[in-house]
Design a protein with these regions (language model features):
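Ubiquitin system architectures
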Residues: 2-112
Length: 112
């Protein structure tokens, strides 16, 4: 069984289903949320801290916005700031248990 902190309350707000698994679950696990702004939905993710931000973005887009054609047109934000190096491990960001990663289109578009 993996070491894990208790699931933060914020992680279960407005999410659906069981948490998605990201990376190896053999060590410590971060309980995160990923929200795709254009999908207006969020998922819970139990992530290995060594998984990359790019892997998290790919998983969230696949689950919440499967019709996306160009993942590189989406940015990942944490605490309001864009994460510029998506190849960095999640542990290298300011993410803690309960953090929410916001994934949104790089360019603002009018509401249809």
């Amino acid at each position: 069984m993996s070491e894990s902190a208790p699931i933060p309350f914020v992680s279960v707000l407005r999410t659906r289903g069981e948490p998605a698994k990201l990376g190896s679950q053999s060590g410590p696990v971060l309980h995160l949320r990923a929200q795709v702004l254009e999908a207006r939905d969020a998922i819970r993710i139990d992530a290995d801290p060594s998984a990359t931000v790019r892997d998290l973005k790919h998983l969230a887009l696949k689950e919440l916005y499967p019709d996306v054609r160009h993942e590189d047109e989406y940015v990942v934000k944490l605490n309001g700031f864009e994460i510029l190096d998506e190849d960095a491990p999640i542990a290298a960001t300011a993410a803690t248990n309960g953090s929410t990663f916001l994934i949104t289109d790089r360019r603002r578009r009018p509401v249809e």
